[in-house]
Swiss-Prot record:
Keywords: Acetylation, Lysosome, Phosphoprotein, Repeat, WD repeat
Phosphothreonine, modified sites: T163, T696
Family under the similarity heading: Belongs to the KCTD3 family.
BTB domain residues: 19-88
GO cellular component: lysosome
Tissues where this protein is expressed: Widely expressed.
Organism per entry: Homo sapiens (Human)
Protein name: SH3KBP1-binding protein 1
Length: 707
């Protein structure tokens, strides 16, 4: 169909401006003039018609361009009229094609349109930004330090790692800066050392884990978020992170805040001080890879799918490891810890009580319930109703199974001895249930089929779940979130979709569609409705996120606030106000100019690149460090605007008008200059480009702040 031809054989490098040029763009024919195609210098078409780019012609002699004809139509219309009519073409596609063709005026206009809703300062939900912390030094050695610790009245050795504070001598305490190659992650791929891997929060505290160290921030009412702790560099990537900021009944004195990190089978625990700093409590071993790490009250819990559970008690400072059935799920409420196992059993642990049997030193782990079909319990959620009597709470447990079933079991406080009773069963999933949440108003389940979500409305009577009329179906939707195959999209534990939020409040899912995305979507967990979307203010990919319920201020009328925390690939941390987003749910946005309105306004000006000349019209240059999209005027418009009908003014009078002499002298000079100077000056004639530009009225070159 098409035959290749050089510029010498095809279109002559020079020709009359009115010469008709025939184009074949993606199989669609266009005809226009050389003048229309070449009025923008150094563009694709100027190079093509000047012979600098070889041409390809079809059988009719038209120049063939292998691009999308639908997108080319508005581009050709812009070349003809200098007006932009997108004609239904998406802005990003139009910008991409304009950049390909080298149409600088159109590129600037489209970039300005994209900047309409984007800002380096975020939107109304943007609440704060924490820059990447300073990388800590690495210890030269990995020698362990042993310190005595009391257990049951006798000293017991507790292994301490190289992360002890530097007050134990000079051996190996100073190290090289971060110049060594980062060790590979468990997936075998190298990790970015400055990437945020995990984020977690508790009350007014935040813990952020990077590849080989972690930092903690504390929110102070007057000064905002303050860095209070930074760990030394570790030897291996951090895979799990846990934080507790309120320990009731602990015996740690001022160290009532703790942060824990797990790497492989090793767990490191630090005590944090409210005013800054921290000290290492110890290093504990589970013996198998840690797959879940969390606090229940003042107990640190670590679990593995192999069936091993480790518990550290803040009061007794005792680390205990117990073997149970292979663990596939867990949940905690109050002081209760529930473990779901692959044999269909649900085990119960009361971690608030002394967790040891005196005769054999085992944890008090008891079987609470067994699934009727003995399917593996792959998701767990426990809900404690408010106390209605002195006998205790009504315990409600929802769990999902490996076969896709969803069951609800309940236990009345007066029938504790008889065990929980099966209350309801749903078989709406055909894939294993991966998440489940039973809250005050909703039952939510998520299965492995691309995060397929099913929700039900829960009916309650006096706080307890009721069968009249029972749970009714509410919504079905998906939270599509693709995972990275090479491990570069962030740690999977740091990209949990949720649901997040208190069980007696609206809960949300956080959706990151692709691993390298810089935009997150916040959706109601009950209906899937979008609450808001946030985009990283610096354009870097989001690698970890979580939702934090922050305590309210002590000021009158304040209330707790909910924040979305996003960790970025460059190490920064951003905060977004979800409380404001939830309050504005359902309200129509009252914005400024729409994209179409902005394009209509831009038709009356011509955007130019930044120029080193001084600003005119009393406008000041933008203080933004990023390159401006526009210029106040070009070099061709440096002619004085104060002269009559474009003629230059006398140099003495011009100097006096620009600031020479006193105020009275300048006023007298204006009077002597004649009445014509008080009229608007006549602009200088529009300079001819010599290329025979299309017959369009001249357009002023303005700065983006001018409109």
């Amino acid at each position: 169909m098409a035959a290749a031809a050089t510029a010498a054989e095809g279109v002559p490098s020079r020709g009359p401006p009115g010469e008709v040029i025939h184009l074949n763009v993606g199989g669609k024919r266009f005809s226009t003039s050389r003048q229309t195609l070449t009025w923008i210098p150094d563009s694709f078409f100027s190079s093509l018609l000047s012979g600098r780019i070889s041409t390809l012609k079809d059988e009719t002699g038209a120049i063939f361009i292998d691009r999308d004809p639908t997108v080319f139509a508005p581009i050709l219309n812009f070349l003809r009229t200098k007006e932009l009519d997108p004609r239904g073409v998406h802005g990003s596609s139009l910008l991409h094609e304009a950049q390909f063709y080298g149409l600088t005026p159109l590129v600037r206009r489209l970039q300005l349109r994209e900047e309409l809703d984007r800002s380096s300062c975020g939107n109304v939900l943007f609440n704060g930004y924490l820059p990447p912390p300073v990388f800590p030094v690495k210890r030269r050695n990995r020698h362990s330090l042993v310190g005595p610790q009391q257990l049951g009245g006798r000293p017991a050795p507790v292994r301490r790692s190289n992360t002890m504070p530097p007050n134990l001598g000079n051996a190996g305490l100073l190290g090289r800066m971060l110049d060594e190659k980062t060790p590979p992650s468990p997936s075998g791929q190298p990790e970015e050392p400055g990437m945020v891997r995990l984020v977690c929060g508790h009350h007014n505290w935040i813990a952020v884990a990077y590849t080989q160290f972690l930092v903690c921030y504390r929110l102070k009412e007057a000064s905002g978020w303050q860095l209070v702790f930074s760990s030394p560099r570790l030897d291996w990537p951090i895979e799990r992170l846990a934080l507790t900021a309120r320990v009731h009944g602990g015996a740690l004195g001022e160290h009532d805040k703790m942060v824990a990190a797990a790497t492989g089978s090793e767990i490191l625990l630090w005590a944090l001080q409210a005013e800054g700093g921290g000290s290492e409590i110890g290093v504990f071993h589970l013996g198998v890879p840690v797959e879940a790490l969390f606090f229940v009250g003042n107990q640190l819990i670590a679990t593995s799918h192999t069936g091993r559970i480790g518990v550290w008690n803040a009061v007794t400072k005792h680390w205990q490891v117990q073997e149970v059935q292979p663990i596939t799920s867990y949940d905690a409420a109050g002081s209760f810890l529930l473990l779901g196992c692959n044999n269909g059993s649900i085990y119960y642990v009361d971690v608030q009580k002394f967790p040891l049997r005196m005769k054999d030193n085992d944890l008090l782990v008891s079987e609470l319930y067994r699934d009727p079909a003995e399917d593996g319990v792959t998701a767990l959620s426990v809900y404690l109703t408010p106390k209605t009597s002195d006998s205790g709470n009504w315990i409600e447990i929802a769990y999902g199974t490996s076969s896709g079933g969803v069951r609800v079991i309940v236990q009345h406080p007066e029938t504790v001895g008889s065990g929980p009773q099966l209350f309801q069963t749903f078989t709406v999933h055909r894939s294993p249930v991966t998440k489940i949440m039973l809250s005050e108003k909703h039952l939510i389940s998520v299965c492995a089929d691309n995060n397929h979500v099913r929700t039900w409305s829960v009916t309650r009577f006096r706080g307890m779940i009721s069968t009249q009329p029972g749970s009714t179906p509410l919504a079905s939707f998906k939270i599509l979130a693709l995972e990275s195959a090479d491990g570069h999209g962030g740690c999977s534990a740091g990209n949990d979709i949720g649901p997040y939020g208190e069980r007696d409040d609206q809960q949300v899912f956080i959706q990151k569609v692709v691993p390298s995305a810089s935009q997150l979507f916040v959706r109601l967990s009950s209906t899937g409705q979008r609450v808001c979307s946030v985009r990283s203010v610096d354009g870097s990919p989001t690698t970890a996120f979580t939702v934090l319920e922050c305590e309210g201020s002590r000021r009158l009328g304040s209330r707790p606030r909910r924040y979305l925390l996003t960790g970025q690939a460059n190490g920064s941390l951003a905060m977004w106000d979800l409380t404001t987003a939830m309050d504005g749910l359902g309200q129509a946005p009252a914005g400024g100019l729409t994209e179409q309105e902005l394009m209509e306004q831009l038709e009356h000006c011509e955007l130019a690149p930044p120029a080193p000349s001084a600003p005119s019209w009393g406008c000041l240059p933008s203080p933004s460090p990023r390159i401006s999209l526009t210029s106040l005027h070009s070099a061709s418009s440096n002619t004085s605007l104060s002269g009559h009908r474009g003629s230059p003014s006398p140099p003495q009078a011009e100097a006096r008008r620009r600031g020479g002499g006193s105020f009275v002298e300048r006023c007298q000079e204006l009077v002597r200059s004649g009445p014509d100077l008080r009229r608007p000056p006549t602009p200088a004639p529009w300079p001819s480009s010599g290329l025979g530009t299309p017959l369009t009225p001249p357009k002023m070159k303005l700065n983006e702040t001018s409109f």
